[in-house]
Amino acid sequence: PLVSALAVMLLYLSIVKVITHWRGKIENFTDVSVVFGGAVIGAMTFAFTDSHWFNAVEAEVYAFSTFFTAIVVWLILLWNEKADENGNERYILIISYMIGLATGLHLLNLLTIPFVTLIVYFRKYKFEWKSFGITMLITAVIFFVIHNGIIKGLPKIAASSIGIYGTTLLIISIFGFMIWSVLNKQNLLSIISCSIVLILIGYSTYTMIYIRSNQDPVIDENDPETLESMISYLEREQYLSLIHISEPTRRYS
């Protein structure tokens, strides 16, 4: 319930920022009523929706996942306000870490990536079809790197002939490149490399599953003790595939 309440709070703050950006600076009571009243109505409507309410009261991943999604949205809107200030990159970095933590919980947060890149694009550039297309291509690359490269790729690399030691060396190399880019003041490269490292640090929470499973606890679903079983666990193979049929096999009255 706590993280669900925090998600509602972050939604309220995000709506305040969106309305303020649209209407401009708050100057009178009417502005106060529209901005804060609209944000309260929007946040409370979401709070009492059936899906969010029942996610809040059950022990599942969706409440935390919603919280991480809400905080990423709020952070990029906060960055939008401070994009011209020195040190605005810190918001991009904390967003990267939040995405890493979130993917260690549920993949829903990956859907915030297009939102983040579009906010950055419209804040920094004037709309043109060519630049917009390039932005969409970059968005797809970022999604592919995180989903296929880090989330699915690293475990498969570790299970391949390269092994755990080779994967560890690869991760150390990424850390080394990050340090080099920061020390040599390569601004764009340092932001990219730091973001990748922060995503890796956040995603590393999955190692807890692997370590805990090897201790053979009483409840050990899917038993991800080996790299092969861990890959199966990460790819959600236990849920099988959904078979679509034209007619329902069971009808409800």
Protein language model features and the residues they cover:
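Transmembrane alpha-helices of multi-pass, membrane-embedded glycan-processing enzymes
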Residues: 2-11, 16-19, 23, 45, ...
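Hydrophobic transmembrane alpha-helices
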Residues: 8, 12-16, 50, 69-81, ...
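Membrane-interface transmembrane helices that cradle and orient dolichyl/undecaprenyl
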Residues: 19, 23-33, 72-91, 118-129
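Membrane-interface alpha helices of multi-pass inner-membrane proteins
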Residues: 42-44, 91-105, 139
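Short acidic/glycine- and proline-prone juxtamembrane loop motifs at membrane-interface regions
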Residues: 51-62
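Perimembrane helix-loop-helix junctions
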Residues: 80-81, 112-196
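Single conserved hydrophobic/aromatic residue that forms the stacking wall/gate
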Residues: 243-253
